[in-house]
Amino acid sequence: MSLRPNSRTEARRSRYKVAVDAEEGRRRREDNMVEIRKNKREENLLKKRREGLLQAQQFPSTAAVSHLDKKLETLPELIAGVWSDDSSLQLECTTQFRKLLSIERNPPIEEVIQSGVVPRFVEFLARDDYPQLQFEAAWALTNIASGTSENTKVVIDYGSVPIFIRLLSSPSDDVREQAVWALGNIAGDSPKYRDLVLGHGALVALLAQFNEQAKLSMLRNATWTLSNFCRGKPQPLFEQTKAALPTLGRLIHSNDEEVLTDACWALSYLSDGTNDKIQAVIEAGVCSRLVELLLHSSPSVLIPALRTVGNIVTGDDIQTQVMIDHHALPCLVNLLTQNYKKSIKKEACWTISNITAGNRNQIQIVIEAGIIAPLVYLLQNAEFEIKKEAAWAISNATSGGNHDQIKFLVSQGCIKPLCDLLVCPDPRIVTVCLEGLENILKIGEADKDLGNTEGVNVYAQLIDEAEGLEKIENLQSHDNTEIYEKAVKILETYWLEEEDVPVSLNEDQFEFGGADISLPSGGFNFS
């Protein structure tokens, strides 16, 4: 299984070699790593409230408040109507409640719950003889479930979930669509409620909605609900959700932006995990279309498509090769070089870093795709969040690359930006840059030993000229033990010549390369 970022440095703590296991260099996404899930998605799209079919709420805010107050004054009347035995009165009053719950801002969800009508609405869901009443009750409950977790819990506790699932086979299009929406809101509340809905068998019933007769509004709602069934941490059981893959494989060929967006988000959730999940996503036949969507004009589609491609290349070399073979790399070059926003460039760099963590053939393909120059440009000039991912991409290439590949990286100017990041506040990135520089120094040393450079490690000189030597010296006083030890090791290996050691020192005062390193006070200084 691929290691997460914090495990990667741990695994490498005691090993300093150029060729590392590709699995070790790959990084699954951390929850907080990429801020692509914008507030808008978090706040608005996990739950959706259905507003009025005609936007009658055109009042100014103060007028709207007084209008609402007047509406609430009629609550006792509406409650009585809902609990009456008169079907037409039940419908009329349920519709009024639904309208109250559909106002644009701050609908009175709490007041409606307190009025005690929720169990009655759940009863109305069973009225197969009166689809219009079912529809209005389902709409009202959908909007109650769009509120807080407590609001959602009320809807669940009155036994609505199995009834909503049964309504997915209603002969009424409107009732089915409203049931889909309600289940999406309930599942979108939390992993706990998502699993409750899935546990009642909702997925199979939901997947049945994706048929040739489905209206676009149903496709949009059902795809959104499907994405909520797949999202959240802890993740749903893959055994439950993988049945969605064939449907998602069809949905990503839609021309509708909303359907595409939510289908790609669902795939991004399903591909976020172990290699068996990644393999199932690959076998759903989605890779070719995902690469096409990396060129989509809408960021709302591009972002989850890129997220999914990025997840797939956290897999093993064979899985990563699938994305390479589908020509993902030219699309990634485009994302690095064109005018895309920070979060997209960052995600693209993260994706590339997991490809450069692959084998030497894959590193060569990255080089031949022309990715290194734009990567180095971002490493030097981009915002820090992008620089961090670019540093991983370059460092991983130095870890797995051969002699000529690493020389090519140096020829593209990677040394100075790696040196510049040695003073960044993120200790993991400092370590990543030190590892990259160390791998480069090893190649310089090999060239020196071959007699190609007149007895000089040319890359050590370049690091010195880039003010890297001074920065590495300063890292000897770093709080992080791994950074401090690695800095000492690099200095000792590539800059400490015999003539620099005072003759008066006894041999046993320093034990370089052993388990213990005894340092002079203040560390080494070669300035």
UniProtKB/Swiss-Prot annotation:
It comes from the Eukaryota. This is Importin subunit alpha. ARM repeats lie at residues 109-151, 152-196, 197-234, 235-279, 280-319, 320-362, 363-403, 404-445. PROSITE patterns: ARM_REPEAT (PS50176), IBB (PS51214). It comes from Solanum lycopersicum (Tomato). The keyword Iron-sulfur does not apply. GO terms for molecular function: nuclear import signal receptor activity; nuclear localization sequence binding. Gene3D superfamilies: Importin-alpha, importin-beta-binding domain (1.20.5.690), Leucine-rich Repeat Variant (1.25.10.10).
